[in-house]
UniProtKB/Swiss-Prot annotation:
A GO CC term assigned to this protein in UniProt: cytosol
Post-translational modification: Acetylation, which is up-regulated by glucose and insulin and down-regulated by glucagon, inhibits the glycogen phosphorylase activity by promoting PPP1R3B-mediated recruitment of phosphatase PP1 and Ser-15 dephosphorylation. Phosphorylation at Ser-15 converts inactive phosphorylase b into active phosphorylase a. Dephosphorylation of Ser-15 by phosphatase PP1 inactivates the enzyme.
Recorded name of the encoding gene: PYGL
Full protein name: Glycogen phosphorylase, liver form
Modified residues (N6-(pyridoxal phosphate)lysine): K681
Amino acid sequence: MAKPLTDQEKRRQISIRGIVGVENVAELKKGFNRHLHFTLVKDRNVATPRDYFFALAHTVRDHLVGRWIRTQQYYYEKCPKRVYYLSLEFYMGRTLQNTMINLGLQNACDEAIYQLGLDMEELEEIEEDAGLGNGGLGRLAACFLDSMATLGLAAYGYGIRYEYGIFNQKIRDGWQIEEADDWLRHGNPWEKARPEFMLPVHFYGRVEHTEAGTKWIDTQVVLALPYDTPVPGYLNNTVNTMRLWSARAPNDFNLRDFNVGDYIQAVLDRNLAENISRVLYPNDNFFEGKELRLKQEYFVVAATLQDVIRRFKASKFDSSNSAETAFDAFPDQVAIQLNDTHPALAIPELMRIFVDIEKLPWSKAWEITQKTFAYTNHTVLPEALERWPVELVENLLPRHLQIIYEINQKHLDKIAALFPKDVDRLRRMSLIEEEGVKRINMAHLCIVGSHAVNGVAKIHSDIVKTQVFKDFSELEPDKFQNKTNGITPRRWLLLCNPGLAELIAEKIGEDYVKDLSQLTKLNSFLGDDIFLREISNVKQENKLKFSQFLEKEYKVKINPSSMFDVQVKRIHEYKRQLLNCLHVVTMYNRIKKDPKKLFVPRTVIIGGKAAPGYYMAKLIIKLITSVAEVVNNDPMVGSKLKLIFLENYRVSLAEKVIPATDLSEQISTAGTEASGTGNMKFMQNGALTIGTMDGANVEMAEEAGEENLFIFGMRVEDVAALDKKGYEAKEYYEALPELKLAIDQIDKGFFSPKQPDLFKDLVNMLFYHDRFKVFADYEAYVKCQEKVSQLYMNPKAWNIMVLKNIAASGKFSSDRTIKEYARDIWNMEPSDIKISLSGEPSGGANKANGK
């Protein structure tokens, strides 16, 4: 008789081995059927297209999960250094197609769905965008997660699971109206709630100093409930985790007072605690010092650091060691990247944990903290820098304020010793600003508390070092680095432009997807007329497809053989959508003046959201829609010129418009755009760039040759010289008749006949307080646009320039960026090991990893 199994042997039957599904068309169809009937409880008679989308998403997810579990088991076995990317924004967009591509399932899924008589594209369009970001900063975080997984780094994205993401933009009567983005209303098939890892986060209260140490007591507690989303690498079986925290009230919330009496009200008040993760603040490059926002920033930081320390202890904490010696290994096991200053409170929070809870001496705690953190700066605009009122922090986080004061005191002592007579330097470098309302400068806190600080393009990093944080870089020059941004070629080429991706693969093979520098091989086809024509054909197909989309969704008919001239990004004065608009008015006036003259037809497309409280940005949208109303309905203009405002620009819309673009507008005032990443997406997708020498445009020109971009306007030093001399907008207005005409038309109500003074504030701003000097670059911009039109009339020369740009875009892969972060900042090595899906290690992995 067989010996009975021990409990341990019985447990071994609970295993992922043997249940990881086969990945072929028949199995995918089976999975689809199973999920439609057993997960969604529908049959084909009552299933809606949304049910079919969910059935497909769950089927694809099944193939993710095996890899996800194996990846976490692998990390537990190998115990690699882990990197934690802390960001208040992750602008992920849609997940289905990206997952199919990264798992190598797209063809099989396409075939399975086709065999089931369904339309794959229709199903993909049902998915909601995960719009948990405003623009570039959040989308960068998403691209970085893709690259970290593709490079086999043990990486975790940590953020907030906002119930409402970036608002949906509606245009009514030419004005922006915001609507709530209830992206979770149908459920989210990709996330997994992890209530077993729920953690407490404390607010308010008071600080008590005793002989045993310092305690933060009488606090209000909010619980942080984690939701995990898998992040697959490209064809390497690595699946990392993005963990987003949702706020929950504890069960005894407002009921702790025995005589509270009003039980119903106490339950209703739970909403107040849960509001922390309710909505994303819709500000891009603008600081709004609201208590709820500060709560969000501390909430993500406090929950994340508890999680990081729990995982560190589960993997490496040897109980025979004292906490002090055990934590010596912390920076060897943990790197934390702060995506802008939003998670800056992680620095005092880690100090609080080390000093108050783990009882480390201050100097040891500070040494470990500095070695752990690194900070990425994303903007040089003064209005975007976070400066929290001391009073607000004192009320919400009293212990953290004490720690910040202590950090500042030691920091200033060090500076005073180095520069004994320089009192003004102390003022400039302090973490606390004393003028007016006392404030904490969060960028200064990040710099002092990190071992590395980086800008996001060469020119931006130079400005950071020589202007914005000059004193700090003089003190510690080696702390400051550059890491030029990048984009993931999986989403921004394979997914959004399969025609171009295949064409490239036919010429140079498929390896470029993981090593984008191989695109330089395309230079050997510059003389290949057939290839140039094929590239042009792909662009034409994309334009046709986008024209049909515009007609269907926006009821706008456009000429698909016109030049598609596109500016899509957040609406902000520094991005100068106004300059673009003035050019449209100028083109319109030229056509009206001489209708018989040859004119290269253009469709100008402008899209982007304005922060709800940003009056000038909203007025700019109204101007664009008003100009469009006149231009598009003038029979004399016909199909020569059209202006479209692209409503509700978001990741999934970017995936449609970018591959269809001929001309990419990157026209910020030199020295204002830190990097930009839209510029890179357009370049990779075969658009030519008209732009200033700003942000990553500078490096794009370096890579492709300045003669292969349409560069115009003031350089950084010209802007500085003009500031010194004094910018007089009137001088340009008087000297340039076409500019004068355009401004007069806007001012006198030509584009707003029912309300002639509608744009007076805008015109007034352009004349008297335009920090971004639109008029100063107008003439150069219009002349440069004439060069663009000329080249467009010579398709072969245009296509050669397009190919040169695609071939030069390899530097701008986020894989390259992440390799540089890993090497220079995190001290980590990418791994090209493909994790085996069959084996399984001994237990304990999930205990340590909490996935």
